Amino acid sequence: MKKTLQDEIEAILRKRIMVLDGGMGTMIQRYKLSEENFQGQEFKDHSRPLKGNNDILSITQPDVIYQIHKEYLLAGADIIETNTFSSTSIAQADYGLEHLAYRMNKCSADVARKAAEEITLQTGVKRFVAGSLGPTNKTLSVSPSVERPDYRNITFDELVEAYQEQAKGLLDGGVDILLIETIFDTANAKAALFALQKLFEENYASPRPIFISGTIVDKSGRTLSGQTGEAFVTSVSHSDPLCIGLNCALGAAEMRPFIETIGKCTTAYVLCYPNAGLPNTFGDYDETPAMMAMHLKDFAVDGLVNVVGGCCGSTPDHIREIAEAVKNCKPRVPPDSVFEGHMLLSGLEPFRIGPYTNFVNIGERCNVAGSKKFAKLIMAGNYEEALSVAKVQVEMGAQVLDINMDDGMLDGPSAMTKFCNFIASEPDIAKVPLCIDSSNFAVIEAGLKCCQGKCIVNSISLKEGEEDFLEKARKIKKFGAAVVVMAFDEEGQATETDVKVSVCTRAYHLLVEKVGFNPNDIIFDPNILTIGTGMEEHNLYAINFIHATRVIKETLPGVRISGGLSNLSFAFRGMDAIREAMHGVFLYHAIKFGMDMGIVNAGSLPVYDDIHKDLLQLCEDLIWNRDAEATEKLLRYAQTHGKGGKKVIQTDEWRNGSIEERLEYALVKGIEKHIVEDTEEARLNREKYPRPLNIIEGPLMNGMKVVGDLFGAGKMFLPQVIKSARVMKKAVGHLIPFMEKEREEARVLNGSVEEEDPYQGTIVLATVKGDVHDIGKNIVGVVLGCNNFRVIDLGVMTPCDKILQAALDHKADIIGLSGLITPSLDEMIFVAKEMERLAIKIPLLIGGATTSRTHTAVKIAPRYSAPVIHVLDASKSVVVCSQLLDENLKDDYFEEILEEYEDIRQDHYESLKERKYLPLSQARKHSFHIDWLSEPHPVKPTFIGTQVFEDYNLQKLVDYIDWKPFFDVWQLRGKYPNRGFPKIFNDKAVGEEARKVYEDAQNMLSILISRKKLRARGVVGFWPAQSVQDDIHLYAEGAVPQAAEPIATFYGLRQQAEKDSSSTDPYHCLSDFVAPLHSGVRDYLGLFAVACFGVEELSKAYEDDGDDYSSIMVKALGDRLAEAFAEELHERVRRELWAYCGSEQLGVTDLRKLRYEGIRPAPGYPSQPDHTEKLTMWRLANIEQATGIRLTESLAMAPASAVSGLYFSNVKSKYFAVGKISKDQIEDYALRKNMSVAEVEKWLGPILGYDTD
């Protein structure tokens, strides 16, 4: 028998590690080819630029590509890749060359073949050519439109067609291997595999070995489309690749753990060709050949790889070093099997079903025939809301999700495609495998074409005969799916035990022997049929299924058993308690007999032992056919019993402990109820606690130490800590009068009294002058207080002299400064200078949203010779403060900080040298362009001037609240895939606490609104507007802009940081989104300011009452309501007040994802970082007089729960970050604003692209 290429290459892989070549693009760049070089003679008159289209060089500059191939081969590469990464008609459409796809691949393969054969002849070592099939520039799993998560700009069939054309060219050019590489989206790779299988089935060419290489995009270990490495392997292993592995995105060191994972879950050989390290700030790769070779040699020595090479940034020098490094290393020995006896499925994550896997719940509610709610949503076209049905199933424990769109009123394939695409947009649903369920095979195919994971098909049968059965089975295998086979043949549905076994046995042999199905991918459904119908012939249906299950599992190795559970109890429709009990009893027995999985309503299955004993007996009698009257008895039971439920018994068992145990328990659990009486009981025990201070120093501080330890270990969360602090304050509050009385008695007796301090240290905290934001500072204060620090909180807008005086008065050990807005940074610098001048040499902590380690190290620390430390959040503050005050640790800690900050400073100054900026004049030439004359003209607002909104209805705002920032306040952050609201509730670590805090918030919100504790006021204004270069001029109503003076000007800042040379991205400025004065097109600009009043007063009242938790809660809710007010008002602006989107119909999710036209950027934020622009807003719209929202000297808004910004209506407007800018723009901006350069530099300090010191 003739040896195949697969045999030949596999023989080499068993002997040694093979070497793949390196980066093609990296080498092409070295030739510095011009547009003319790319065009060559043939394409000199082509209508589009071709520079950058590396693949065309195989036609226009074949000698260059040939030379690159030779260099890699001479460096030691066993395998070279064709220059065809983007040679599909899909990718080439960008260059207008899609018609050349076949030729491009054929020419590239010819060139590579020629080089390989020449070096084979020259060296006597056979070299191979791998045909590269890249990912294309489109994806099946990710929508290119944020607004339409179900939209795809490519189909599976289009990809198959494109990959077939590419593969034909490669095969005709003589490639030895087909390499599907840089897989960002596994669905695309599955289309490529489908195309190759099709070609080989059609005998287009003899089969070639297949190599598959995925791309893990970062340290999360996932592809761009969200799959883990193991899920990726599971999804593509049906193609039996000779090699599977990873390339691109990561350097070798970063790739190692993911290569290890790949090796553990495949019987294929493993290939690995990483980048030459990670890209630096200029996009270049810094890893030397020696470094890269060292890493890959480690891989080889540890038995991880069979093929190694290089991707981006690697060169023949890298490959030479790599080849030398691994030449004496033994190759990885692939295991004979992995996960033996397991069914392997995948969504974004792998799911293995093995001999010891518990019963698998296949969620049933995404079925238009089985769920009225789901059907109603799908029929109404409300797919996004229908996702909630899927989500609930997964949350309730469904490990696989059944999707069924079989309804005569639906276009089944279209509905299946759309819903599967929606699922792909939701990681918390897409993580589980899908079960594509339909009686119409066209619908099944439609579903399979959307799924990147390994699915289950439900179902096929022998109903239409063997030929139909085998045809469908082969297609399913080509998609890589597992299959459910119904016990149904040409004679009909099997109801008797022996017939069920017979039909399943016949199907098994057909699948395994004629189709080549892995037995582990076969699931039999022996038909769960309805019992309790009153018809005698139905009485044995449950027993027959159970007995058939046992025989099938015993006689057909590897298979699984499933069934649709709801069929069993269909006779008891509407009697949920009866149905759920029947399901629980049936499964209890069926699982014992071998049932592995079932289509169930996840979460509604009762535990067998929890079923009421009378109901349990009735269900047992019905299922096992023990009582002819079982159906009637069940119906009578249903009439006399409700659903019932277990009563939760509260226990106060902890109250039986000692006084110390009770105090500690109350503190840890945040229970206030008994704290005063327990504290008093301790106080009265004079023998144990002679003085009230002893109680604070003893049991109370011991309890708070436990709280601090649990918080530090991540076993308690911020809301719990704050509740503990509330209990502590109440206990201390009870003791204070007794301590003061004791102190007074001592003073009278002795004439003076020595102060005693039970605290670890004293810390003065303040939000700096001009800033009104203090939630973060307050939280830090509470956490420090819980850890035995005395906290002096000076509140907001605190002048420097007051901070320093308080530090002296209270003999502070540390000062902590907080700020949210950028001008606060300058105030912090000023405080540091004053501390140095006055020789107040105590540590200075810096925190707040606008602060950073870099700013602290570069701008603040050099002004002060004592420790200056940036503290990220409350959880870090305790560790920092403890080290700063520990006599044994503080000197070493400070020395470490000094060294760290010096490194940060040096890195910063080096980065300033490396940054490149376009001159402002050039940036303006590359501005964002809108063709104002051909675009629809801007809509005029319904009024010009301002409209004030008094006492706005807060209830209207509740639905617009974005809860994610609320949880951020409490430092509750879920981990993927449970980030954000409401997914955070599913997080194992913080979910429970998040739900508690959310419930507390709902309760407080209800009180705040119903009792009118807060008030919302705002203002909106519109004016005619025209852009003049980077500025926007506003005009009075009726004025002719070309002939009138503007009544106000908003000044813009333009991006200047140089973009990559290959980028065509414009350099944005907000003025780009307003029609220019010279265009003659009338345009408009809006502004708004909204606030929630009463928050500070309520917060202060709670604080005075010792209730820090409620104090912080009301501020967090005030901020959320203000943001919700801004969101709701913007919607009204779009639909009513400006009415440029009168027909907009968006849900809250759409608003959160910015799926609307127009933007509302705020001064002081990335699109216009200059806070002084607020002064123009306040003057123009008379905002303070209209609403009561005022500006502080640092231009923060007061009250703190306030939001303001500008309204832009253009459909092309978008948010962007100005980023760093250079001095020429600062000087230009200062001139336009009539400000000094120094003053502008002060306000724009954080975005200066140069150092002013």
Curated annotation (Swiss-Prot):
SMART domains given in the database record: B12-binding_2
Residues that hold Zn(2+) according to the record: C248, C311, C312
Binding site for S-adenosyl-L-methionine: D962, R1160, Y1215, F1216
Localization per Swiss-Prot or TrEMBL: Cytoplasm
Stretches assigned to the AdoMet activation domain: 911-1253
EC number: 2.1.1.13
Main location group: cytoplasm
Protein's pathway: Amino-acid biosynthesis; L-methionine biosynthesis via de novo pathway; L-methionine from L-homocysteine (MetH route): step 1/1
Cofactor(s) it depends on: methylcob(III)alamin; Zn(2+)
Phosphothreonine PTM positions: T1252
Domain B12-binding per the UniProt entry, residue ranges: 760-895
Binding site for (6S)-5,6,7,8-tetrahydrofolate: G370, S371, K372, D437, N458, D525, N567, R573, R579
Gene Ontology, cellular component aspect: cytosol
Amino-acid positions noted as binding methylcob(III)alamin in the UniProt annotation, renumbered to this chain: E697, G770, D771, V772, H773, D774, S818, T822, A874
Catalytic activity: (6S)-5-methyl-5,6,7,8-tetrahydrofolate + L-homocysteine = (6S)-5,6,7,8-tetrahydrofolate + L-methionine
Free-text comment on the cofactor: Binds 1 zinc ion per subunit.
InterPro entries associated with the record: Cbl-bd_cap, Cobalamin-bd, Cobalamin-bd_sf, Dihydropteroate_synth-like_sf, HCY_dom, HCY_dom_sf, Met_Synthase/Corrinoid, Met_synthase_B12-bd
Stored Gene3D superfamilies: Cobalamin-binding domain (3.40.50.280), Cobalamin-dependent Methionine Synthase, domain 2 (1.10.288.10), Dihydropteroate synthase-like (3.20.20.20), Homocysteine-binding-like domain (3.20.20.330), Methionine synthase domain (1.10.1240.10), Vitamin B12-dependent methionine synthase, activation domain (3.10.196.10)
Subunit structure: Monomer. Dimer. Forms a multiprotein complex with MMACHC, MMADHC and MTRR.
Free-text note regarding domains: Modular enzyme with four functionally distinct domains. The isolated Hcy-binding domain catalyzes methyl transfer from free methylcobalamin to homocysteine. The Hcy-binding domain in association with the pterin-binding domain catalyzes the methylation of cob(I)alamin by methyltetrahydrofolate and the methylation of homocysteine. The B12-binding domain binds the cofactor. The AdoMet activation domain binds S-adenosyl-L-methionine. Under aerobic conditions cob(I)alamin can be converted to inactive cob(II)alamin.
Protein's UniProt name: Methionine synthase
Species of provenance: Rattus norvegicus (Rat)
